[in-house]
Amino acid sequence: MVKKNDLFIDVSSHNGYDITGILEQMGTTNTIVKISESTTYLNPCLSAQVEQSTPIGFYHFARFGGDVAEAEREAQFFLDNVPTQVKYLVLDYEDDPSGNAQANTNACLRFMQMIADAGYTPIYYSYKPFTLDNVDYQQILAQFPNSLWIAGYGLNDGNADFEYFPSMDGIRWWQYSSNPFDKNIVLLDDEEDEKPKTAGTWKQDSKGWWFRRNNGSFPYNKWEKIGGVWYYFDSKGYCLTSEWLKDNEKWYYLKDNGAMVTGWVLVGSEWYYMDDSGAMVTGWVKYKNNWYYMTNERGNMVSNEFIKSGKGWYFMNTNGELADNPSFTKEPDGLITVA
């Protein structure tokens, strides 16, 4: 939990392996540490910087511009490399925008939604002029209220001079200086997390994780809701992880921490959509304002091809969305229909 007027620094490999000195200068141990950039770069100093500080979040430097599919790939790369549990994951969007502000906004929103779907609170970081020129930040706030972290330095003398505050709606944190390192102040209290109390304790042995209830029993061959999350335990009481489960003729997916997935999930190279009960959806899926099609055979999302549904043919874009104006070199047999 961070409160109004708390301070923190954000760090990357630029700050080196030893950040104890700048933490002491700042008078805090709070950090937001860079994890990744694009889909290949990882901060080589990450482990050391995490060990020396108290991370309140992590950030990813985006290179996806206005490409939603690339934003999804970058978000997944970011999520796959989060080293420890935190509340906030940050989209650092300050370079390589496309010339289309709406496309940029859509890509940012998709990235942030994947962060939210994974159980984190998404934050948008940039500076005011760049944001006003390239992103509709009000759309971001409509979906993720109070999610902005904005840089604005004024005299950049190391002090938080509110005469130079970059006034915008929805700012949670302000990066007020980069001299001699990035300095930040919290403007809004964290909301209290309402996490259900668990009625037992997680245990681990050489075979995996299991859950010991307070009365000494443990779940097996069943679903169990623990801390507001559903898990499935096998016949020996071990939690299933990173695998598909067929139960009552429906398919479910358990994440690497055992939690049942709802919403979108990337398994291997394929996207799937799970409903609110966790069951895999086939056929048409309406998500936000877009339509997607999941195959009846395997449930994977169709992309960059025509599909036949009912009496009509539909074209699904490379990001899986139903095309408004399908483009093709050879019209398939049958009627082309666009919803």
UniProtKB/Swiss-Prot annotation:
A Pfam family matched in the record: Choline_bind_1
MF terms (GO), sorted A to Z: lysozyme activity
Keyword Repeat: yes
Record GO biological process: cell wall macromolecule catabolic process; defense response to bacterium; killing of cells of another organism; peptidoglycan catabolic process
UniProt keyword terms in alphabetical order: Antimicrobial, Bacteriolytic enzyme, Glycosidase, Hydrolase, Repeat
Keyword presence, Hydrolase: yes
Residues annotated as the enzyme's active site: D10, D92, E94
Protein name in UniProt: Lysozyme
Gene: CPL9
